[in-house]
UniProtKB/Swiss-Prot annotation:
Gene Ontology BP annotations: carbohydrate derivative metabolic process
Protein source organism: Streptomyces avermitilis (strain ATCC 31267 / DSM 46492 / JCM 5070 / NBRC 14893 / NCIMB 12804 / NRRL 8165 / MA-4680)
SIS domain: residues covered: 36-220
Family: Belongs to the UPF0309 family.
The name this protein goes by in its record: UPF0309 protein SAV_3856
Annotated CDD domains: SIS_RpiR (cd05013)
Pfam family name, one: SIS_2
Length: 251
């Protein structure tokens, strides 16, 4: 099979997943956008967390041109990405019981805030405990996961539960277990993951909804502009001064 044919198949698969998310997740997307708008309007703060490659979608929300300035990354050292050596350390830390409690205790997250937790499988201790503990603090949790994992894998948390079981709102990415969209007779393993594409788009749909909801209420959404357009830095400086008490990535 030609390389171009495989490229087309992957793009078709990704487009198909995006269409499913658009059609089947419309209700939770609207609910999540409304929750974020409510939180912004009520003086709450916004946080996003993801481990490993799930962190990419979280990072895409933070200090982002066209995004809400109030979204902060809840970072866990060694877990955020593949910048640690060995890269497998992050996967091991995701399975450590009690880590989420230590992270939340040392973070500015408090009652009335929103925490977006992204975990494709939703089966490891860190995202499960992060959601459980955050809700116990009075934090609203939006979980982004593939619900299919709950029926096709075993939870790695002592409770036997998954991220989806401890969220106020669940966004289902519809990614198949294994996160690989293509197979080929001449290649032993499935390949071409689409979770980052879909999860990132899903969350940007939520943020767009939040911005529109705020505008409908007569509230200017605290959006950032690109620093690479004229006037962008001045605009961002104004927004950050106005909302500085809710922005933690400048401290």
């Amino acid at each position: 099979m030609s390389e171009s044919k495989l490229a087309e198949q992957f793009l078709d698969a990704a487009i198909g997943l995006l269409q499913r998310v658009r059609d089947e997740d419309a209700e939770p997307i609207a609910a999540a956008g409304t929750l974020i708008a409510d939180t912004v309007a009520d003086g709450g703060r916004l946080f996003a967390f993801g481990a490993g490659h799930s962190s990419l979608a979280a990072q895409d929300l933070v200090y982002r041109a066209g995004g809400l300035a109030l979204m902060n990354l809840l970072a866990v050292p060694g877990v955020v990405g593949v910048d640690v050596m060995p890269a497998t350390l992050g996967s091991a830390l995701e399975r450590v019981d009690g880590l989420a409690s230590a992270v939340l205790d040392s973070s500015p997250v408090r009652s009335g805030d929103v925490l977006v937790i992204i975990s494709l499988s939703g089966r490891n201790a860190l995202p499960v405990e992060m959601s459980m503990n955050a809700r116990a603090l009075g934090v609203k949790v939006i979980g982004v996961t593939s619900v299919a994992y709950a029926s096709q894998t075993r939870s790695r948390h002592v409770s036997g539960t998954y991220l989806k079981d401890h969220c106020d709102i669940v966004l289902d990415s519809r990614i198949a277990v294994g996160d690989a969209e293509l197979t080929l007779d001449t290649i032993e393993a499935p390949f071409a993951p689409a979770s980052t594409v879909v999860t990132t788009a899903l969350l940007q749909a939520v943020m767009a909804t939040a911005a529109g909801t705020l505008a409908d209420r007569g509230i200017e959404p605290p959006l950032l502009r690109s620093g690479n357009v004229d006037g962008g830095h001045d605009w961002n400086d104004r927004v950050m001064r106005e909302y500085g008490d809710r922005i933690f990535y400048r401290r």
